[in-house]
From Swiss-Prot:
Record-given protein name: Transport and Golgi organization protein 2 homolog
Gene: TANGO2
Keyword set, alphabetical order: Cytoplasm, Golgi apparatus, Mitochondrion
Taxonomic source organism: Bos taurus
Location within or outside the cell: Cytoplasm; Mitochondrion; Golgi apparatus
GO CC annotations, alphabetized: cytoplasm; cytosol; Golgi apparatus; mitochondrion
Upper lineage: Eukaryota, Metazoa, Chordata, Craniata, Vertebrata
Amino acid sequence: MCIIFFKFDPRPVSKNAYRLILAANRDEFYHRPARAADFWGSNNEVLSGLDMEEGKEGGTWLGISTRGKLAALTNYLQPRLNRNARGRGELVAQFLTSDMDSLSYLKKVSAEGHLYNGFNLIAADLSAEKGDVICYYGNRGEREPVVLAPGTYGLSNALLETPWRKLCFGKQLFLEAVERGRELPRDALVAQLLAVLSNDEAQLPDPAIEAQGREYVRPILSKYAAVCVRCPDYGTRTSTVILVDADGHVTFTERSMLGSDPTRWETTTHEFRLQS
């Protein structure tokens, strides 16, 4: 599972402010193969981690391109999965390489949403010329995607802004870190946000998670109900912070688990300027 917090301010009042601040955790089985975030060999405009699971190779959960296209995915918690459904990671990868705008792309996805297990998809076009646009679609919610107003949002494994306790708790920590970061250099803000993503305090009880996940989630509820998930074979493997400033400078920092060892981590940062 995953969790995402983001603050969207397309016209920041200060040159030192950010058009987008995003902090996200990817939770996955430790044995599932993946590549750490880097620019794609086949397309050096796109930066993301990559799923390397057999049959799902090339999918991703979060990425951004130098053209200003950004997408992020979470699974929708459901007790049973359709093993014949299409891989959800392709939804992010296809948008990052497409020429479609975010709303048009999500409208296309909404027509095919029944082919996938439950998911939530954020798609954004970041352009100083045309204005930043962020859209959302979840295939377990409304039939049409929505354009998001500027503001701060939280998304986990239910629909956007569903008030799971861990989402509300994490969103408050995120807001506090962003507020403190107004007076801090970029690296310090990134460190504050990574600390938020590392919080493993279980937010219990949470009957909403239990009701949605039923028998699938009950055995791991005490671990799952935290921003940072820590189970023996499953949990938070990657934490990502993306900052986009008023001038279109992007800072993409990823903290990723080395192998299957939750005591060993590596942090890398990529920086570039948006083309538009």
